[in-house]
Curated annotation (Swiss-Prot):
The keyword Transit peptide applies. It is found in: Plastid, Chloroplast. PANTHER family: GLUCOSE-1-PHOSPHATE ADENYLYLTRANSFERASE-RELATED, INACTIVE GLUCOSE-1-PHOSPHATE ADENYLYLTRANSFERASE SMALL SUBUNIT 2, CHLOROPLASTIC. Pfam families: LbH_GLGC, NTP_transferase. Expressed at very low levels in leaves, inflorescences, fruits, and roots. One of its GO terms (biological process) is glycogen biosynthetic process. This is Inactive glucose-1-phosphate adenylyltransferase small subunit 2, chloroplastic. One of its GO terms (molecular function) is ATP binding.
């Protein structure tokens, strides 16, 4: 079993380590693979096949997004590390698997090398056959299409010949950079019960955000009568989403989560017949489907949901993973790539309200309210507060440091050096933080581009670049 939940994080709350219970470990090792991945998920309408035979998921790995730079400098949004041991796309793939949807296509294009590698290593073995899989579809050029994908709709249109391989009845379209837990079975059942052509997931309990996936006007029967995206209307506040239509019935404006269930026939008709020039699902296909008279419904979701589309959102999502996002749910485990890493080692570390990933080496340090990723090394007398340490790809030994020091004049080991202090910062992979370094945003800068010095500032958060070297005694 190559896909596993073996890389469970270690979570600390007020010095008391919360571990997976022994029965949970027993379950992880002994749980029958067929029970886990091929449950009997017949829906309320008995004419439909189980979801693992009737629904295919299409997951977008994420395009170029300047709001997440520099985290997307060398990786796509879906490949960004989250909560110490995982990648963002793992949350969406896990939702599919836990819901019994085991035909999963991941469309990738922008900076896709690390994402393609992660998906192929993490999920290549769970299928037990050609009809249960996570298949990566990388952007391609052909004699007919010599350009790259021009948008979400264009990507699906050009890959329809792949998606049509199996006789599924619905496609579940998912962004790969959202953090949430959802039972897609309920969504599919709602879609089928209402006999909708398209069902859009709406968010009923989120605070005001600048929603990139748009707003939908929903009537009393949950029918979507209008769909607008950012730029076509002003941001609607939570308090003013209800309105009265011209016929006297009430409607409300609901933010879209960018999650769609689309019937197979409707998908083909829209992309190949009605809207053959359209490139984007949210701004063109959904409004076009409403104009064509298709039945578009809303399915409301009131759980935790975060669109990780900015540095601030990424920071919030990690902090939320400490407080309330449950990784220890036996019914809805979070899967990722299995790794052969040892348990984290701690000498006299003081750790509170934090998550520590696998294989960390923590000396006499203090960690408060932080996420510490895999293979992180933190030296003596270091204080880390309200920060995200992404981790490292390798362990670097003293002899490696001495050798590299002679070759490249790099004398700082990967990790965080003695007596350094890090507060409200993001330290990307393989960064070298010297001794007595202060990463505290001393001047309270909101936005700053200092890549030559190895860091940038976004929304008041300092981001240390991947592979950056911060010299001893630096104050940022």
């Amino acid at each position: 079993m190559q896909i596993s939940s073996s890389s469970f994080i270690t979570k600390f709350t007020n010095l008391h380590m919360v571990r997976s219970t022994s029965d949970h470990h027993q379950w992880r090792h002994n749980y029958n693979l067929k029970q886990l991945f091929i449950p009997n998920l017949s829906v309320s309408n008995s004419q439909h096949l189980p979801l693992n035979q009737s629904v295919a998921a299409i997951v977008f790995g994420g395009g170029s997004d300047s709001e997440l730079y520099p985290l997307t400098k060398t990786r796509s949004k879906g490949a960004i590390p989250i909560a110490a041991n995982y990648r963002l796309i793992d949350a969406v793939i896990s939702n599919c698997i836990n819901s019994g949807i085991t035909k999963i296509y991941a469309i990738t294009q922008f900076n896709s090398t690390s994402l393609n590698s992660h998906l192929s290593k993490a999920y290549s073995g769970f299928g037990l056959g050609k009809d249960r899989f996570v298949e990566v579809i990388a952007a391609y050029q052909s004699l007919e299409d010599q350009g790259w994908f021009q948008g979400t709709a264009d990507a699906i249109r050009r890959c329809l010949w792949v998606f049509e391989e199996f006789p599924v009845t619905e496609f579940l379209v998912l962004p790969g950079h959202h953090l949430y837990k959802m039972d897609y079975k309920m969504l599919i059942e709602d879609h089928r019960r209402s006999r909708a052509d398209i069902t859009i997931v709406g968010l009923s309990s989120v605070t005001d955000h600048d929603f990139g996936f748009g707003f939908m006007e929903v009537d009393s029967t949950n029918a979507v009568t209008r769909f607008t995206i950012k730029g076509q209307q002003d941001l609607i506040s939570v308090a003013n989403r209800t309105a009265t239509r011209s016929d006297g019935t009430s409607s409300c404006s609901v933010p879209s989560a960018g999650i769609y269930v689309i019937g197979r026939e409707q998908m083909v008709k829209l992309l190949r017949e009605c809207l053959i020039k359209s490139k984007d699902l949210a701004s063109e296909i959904i409004p076009g489907a409403i104009s064509e008279g298709m039945k578009v419904k809303a399915h409301m979701f009131d759980g935790y949901w975060e669109d990780v589309r900015s540095i601030g959102a990424y920071y919030r999502a990690n902090m939320e993973s400490i407080k309330s996002y449950r990784f220890y749910d036996r019914q809805c485990p979070l899967y990722t790539m299995p790794r052969c890493l040892p348990p984290s080692s701690m000498s006299v570390a003081v750790i509170t309200n934090s998550i520590i990933g696998d294989g960390c080496i923590l000396d006499k340090c203090v960690i408060r309210g932080s996420v510490v990723g895999m293979r992180t090394r933190i030296a003596d007398e270091v204080i880390v507060e309200d920060s995200i340490i992404v981790g490292s790809d390798i362990y670097e030994m003293e002899e490696d440091v001495r050798r590299k020091g002679k070759e490249k004049k790099i004398e700082i080991r990967i990790g965080i050096g003695e007596k350094s202090r890090i507060r409200r910062a993001i330290v990307d992979k393989n960064a070298r933080i010297g001794k007595n370094v202060m990463i505290i945003n001393r001047d309270n800068v909101e936005e700053g581009n200092r890549e030559a010095q190895g860091y940038v500032i976004r929304e008041g958060i300092i981001i240390i670049l991947r592979n950056a070297v911060i010299p001893n005694d630096s104050i940022l």
